[in-house]
């Protein structure tokens, strides 16, 4: 009996230690939600509790949005007034309708709003991770901006800044100067199981590198990437090094007359273990860059 209780206790202990804490308070009134890929909710989220309302950054999938709202309600009962979409990709925006139904206004760059209206329907119809979008709807940004939009109540300040084209045409970031925090969307990921998506039709690789250089020059202590663990300026630099290395090797291969599949076999990105460890993702990225550069 004692042995059975010991084993049961050990199992519970191991299980609890293996569970990841999804929400962390990063500063007074600032909270981070870890996007759990194992539950098909892979996009990270940050929210800021202002004096009278909440601003959230990225909407996840509908089921992820529902959980995020539940977590926000554990921190405050103030209304969720704004949700910022860093870019149009489905894992960051398909939860928009859940937030709108809770009273929020969706915010993005003008380019992201335009991309969202013309792209993404196929992914919506297919669902994600075996889950259907039935019962939900696509919801587009109703508040857009050209270059910058600032929320400031004297306690918190969040600057929404257009950085695209880079990962997508309309990339935007959220910068919290007082807390020295940066929310990057997928301009930067950290430990994402599939590396990074470089296949977007409007991706601008050289501009993406310059954007990462610019962001790394800001006064930042904490980077909240689009996917994966919290990082620092070093995370931005690692992301840049991976993209630059892959881009250089593909360009060199094209100049040497090598085919796309030859480059998939030959290009070595193992020096970037956070990004280059997934062979399927790496192959997809190499093919995407090859096709774009050959246009």
Which residues are covered by each model-predicted region?
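Bacterial Sec-dependent N-terminal signal peptides
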Residues: 1-20
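Metallo-beta-lactamase
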Residues: 20, 24-25, 53-54, 61-63, 114-245, ...
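Conserved beta-strand hairpin/beta-sheet module of binuclear metal-dependent hydrolase folds
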Residues: 24-71, 174-184
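Divalent metal-coordination and catalytic microenvironments
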Residues: 29, 48, 58, 72, ...
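Acidic/histidine-rich helix-loop elements
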Residues: 33-41, 116-125, 131-133, 192-204
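Active-site metal-binding motif and surrounding structural segment of the metallo-beta-lactamase
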Residues: 50-53, 63-107
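Accessory terminal helices/loops
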Residues: 217-219, 230-295
